[in-house]
Curated annotation (Swiss-Prot):
<keyword id="KW-0007">Acetylation</keyword>
<feature type="region of interest" description="Disordered">
    <location>
        <begin position="101"/>
        <end position="120"/>
    </location>
</feature>
<feature type="region of interest" description="Disordered">
    <location>
        <begin position="235"/>
        <end position="271"/>
    </location>
</feature>
<dbReference type="GO" id="GO:0005886">
    <property type="term" value="C:plasma membrane"/>
</dbReference>
<feature type="domain" description="UBA 1">
    <location>
        <begin position="187"/>
        <end position="231"/>
    </location>
</feature>
<dbReference type="GO" id="GO:0051604">
    <property type="term" value="P:protein maturation"/>
</dbReference>
<dbReference type="InterPro" id="IPR009060">
    <property type="entry name" value="UBA-like_sf"/>
</dbReference>
<keyword id="KW-0833">Ubl conjugation pathway</keyword>
<comment type="function">
    <text>Non-catalytic component of the KPC complex, a E3 ubiquitin-protein ligase complex that mediates polyubiquitination of target proteins, such as CDKN1B and NFKB1. The KPC complex catalyzes polyubiquitination and proteasome-mediated degradation of CDKN1B during G1 phase of the cell cycle. The KPC complex also acts as a key regulator of the NF-kappa-B signaling by promoting maturation of the NFKB1 component of NF-kappa-B by catalyzing ubiquitination of the NFKB1 p105 precursor.</text>
</comment>
<feature type="domain" description="Ubiquitin-like">
    <location>
        <begin position="14"/>
        <end position="98"/>
    </location>
</feature>
<dbReference type="InterPro" id="IPR041927">
    <property type="entry name" value="UBA2_UBAC1"/>
</dbReference>
<dbReference type="GO" id="GO:0031593">
    <property type="term" value="F:polyubiquitin modification-dependent protein binding"/>
</dbReference>
<feature type="domain" description="STI1">
    <location>
        <begin position="353"/>
        <end position="392"/>
    </location>
</feature>
<feature type="compositionally biased region" description="Basic and acidic residues">
    <location>
        <begin position="108"/>
        <end position="120"/>
    </location>
</feature>
<comment type="subunit">
    <text>Component of the KPC complex composed of RNF123/KPC1 and UBAC1/KPC2. Interacts (via ubiquitin-like domain) with RNF123. Interacts (via ubiquitin-like and UBA domains) with the proteasome via its N-terminal domain.</text>
</comment>
<feature type="domain" description="UBA 2">
    <location>
        <begin position="288"/>
        <end position="328"/>
    </location>
</feature>
<dbReference type="Pfam" id="PF23326">
    <property type="entry name" value="UBL_UBAC1"/>
</dbReference>
Length: 405
């Protein structure tokens, strides 16, 4: 019996499920050594009912192994592509590549891009070469534009000095500031959480030390306790914070105040007492660095003095202080207490304003200025106050007017 040679050496016959994109399905038999290209040709003949419509149709289609989602290579055999019996293959037409743009289209697109492109400096100079020039120093104009919040601090420092001199001439100023100072003392007393203070004193810490620790650590008992342990051997641990005085000193101050308020007090004594009140208010404004922030920034390698300066400039904001230390360190700590030039047009315009002149004779205005220096975020509160708001509004208007001119 005669047997063809290709039948003798033929590989294993596989039955494959073929699915076309139009939904047609059929079984195709092929040996393992059949190439993918040959199998694809047979599948296309099946779809075209025995003949190919286009000789290029083979290259325009592809076979995909459904289970692995692989595109089969035309040059490889079914065995090399690891196709198994009863596998499902998808016959799909390849996507036609997008046609290359014509040269005319490319030129039009490039021209459109050039038309939309912003002009460079040379193009601007060429276009404006015939225009008349004006002697305007733009760099100077930009430099003279000042930030209101930055200048406000300088203005407040200078206005505080003027207000103190004006109020020193008021015979009732001493009594007014005594009441205002008493209110400040009450505010400070209210800042100490009695429950937190009791908790620390029950642990055995002295009351004065516990009070100081709570004030330095924002009323946090764990942080205050840690601070007390760390500073137990510190010789200055019993030293009152700025603006505070021991009970004996407070009693002496009260006695002196009562004596000065007597009928026999002279004008000079009243002025001295008012000066002391001003100093006490100023001491309340003295900066107290956040102990936690100081430790954190010093652990980064910064010097303690630099850290305190950074926190003072940035109102105890640790992140802002860190950026200040890493940056150009502007403004400097020395600039914080520096007032505005008394001979400057801005300051003279502020002093000439009737609303400001009237406000400077009000002790509440001075207290507002002091508070805004310590807490810049409180500016909004004082702007809405019926007594201090008009003064702040006039200062802002004068600044904006002169800043534009």
């Amino acid at each position: 019996m005669f047997v063809q040679e290709e039948k003798i050496f033929a590989g294993k016959v596989l039955r494959l499920h073929i699915c076309a994109s139009d939904g047609a399905e059929w079984l195709e038999e092929a040996t393992e050594d059949t190439s993918v290209e040959k199998l694809k040709e047979r599948c296309l003949k099946h779809c075209a009912h025995g003949s190919l419509e286009d000789p290029k149709s083979i290259t325009h289609h592809k076979l995909i192994h459904a289970a692995s989602e692989r595109v089969l290579s035309d040059a490889r055999t079914i065995l090399e592509e690891n196709i198994q019996d009863q596998d499902v293959l998808l016959l799909i037409k390849k996507r036609a590549p997008s046609p290359l743009p014509k040269m005319a289209d490319v030129s039009a697109e490039e021209k459109k891009k050039q038309d939309q492109k912003a002009p460079d400096k040379e193009a601007i100079l060429r276009a404006t070469a015939n225009l008349p020039s004006y002697n305007m120093d733009r760099a100077a104009v930009q430099t003279n534009m000042r930030d209101f919040q930055t200048e406000l601090r300088k203005i407040l420092v200078s206005l505080i000095e003027v207000a103190q001199k004006l109020l020193a001439l008021n015979p009732d100023a001493v009594e007014l500031f005594k009441k205002a100072n008493a209110m400040l003392d009450e505010d400070e007393d209210e800042r100490v959480d009695e429950a937190a203070l009791r908790q620390l004193t029950e642990m055995g810490f002295p009351e004065n030390r516990a009070t100081k620790a709570l004030q330095l650590n924002h009323m946090s008992v764990p942080q205050a306790m840690e601070w007390l342990i760390e500073h137990a051997e510190d010789p200055t641990i019993d030293t009152p914070l700025p603006g505070q005085a021991p009970p004996e000193a407070e009693g002496a101050t009260a006695a002196a105040s009562e004596a000065a308020a007597g009928a026999s007090a002279t004008d000079e004594e009243a002025r001295d007492e008012l000066t002391e009140i001003f100093k006490k208010i100023r001491r309340k404004r003295e900066f107290r660095a956040d102990a936690r922030a100081v430790i954190s920034l010093m652990e980064m390698g910064f010097d303690e003095k630099e850290v305190i300066d950074a926190l003072r400039v940035n109102n105890n904001q640790q992140n802002a202080a860190c950026e200040w230390l890493l940056g150009d360190r502007k403004p400097s700590p020395e600039e914080l207490d520096k007032g505005i030039d008394p001979d400057s047009p801005l300051f003279q315009a502020i002093l000439d304003n009737p609303v400001v002149q009237l406000g400077l004779t009000n002790p509440k205005t001075l207290l507002a200025f002091e508070d805004m220096l310590e807490n810049p975020l409180n500016s909004t509160q004082w702007m809405n106050d019926p007594e201090t708001g008009p003064v702040m509004l006039q200062i802002s208007r004068i600044f904006q007017t002169l800043n534009r001119t």
